[in-house]
Amino acid sequence: MPKMKSVKGAVKRFKVKKSGKIKRGTAYRSHILTKVDGKHHRQMRSSKHVDTVDAKNIKEMIN
């Protein structure tokens, strides 16, 4: 049986950390950010972690 291919879009969007948690970027950061206040804009800069409910599916897509 052949190996499962990883989903390339998921590989580009997510990184698995040493602890096993999955790191992701923040949404709504592509354009029209002049309307967003400074505090929200700064908070969106930092990366987030994927929820444990979604982590299993994402790990299957990556591996």
UniProtKB/Swiss-Prot annotation:
InterPro entries: Ribosomal_bL35, Ribosomal_bL35-like, Ribosomal_bL35_CS, Ribosomal_bL35_sf. GO terms for molecular function: structural constituent of ribosome. The keyword Protein biosynthesis does not apply. It comes from the Bacteria. One of its GO terms (cellular component) is cytosolic large ribosomal subunit. GO terms for biological process: translation. Keywords: Ribonucleoprotein, Ribosomal protein. Belongs to the bacterial ribosomal protein bL35 family. NCBIfam families: rpmI_bact. PANTHER family: 54S RIBOSOMAL PROTEIN BL35M, LARGE RIBOSOMAL SUBUNIT PROTEIN BL35M. This is Large ribosomal subunit protein bL35. It comes from Sulfurovum sp. (strain NBC37-1).
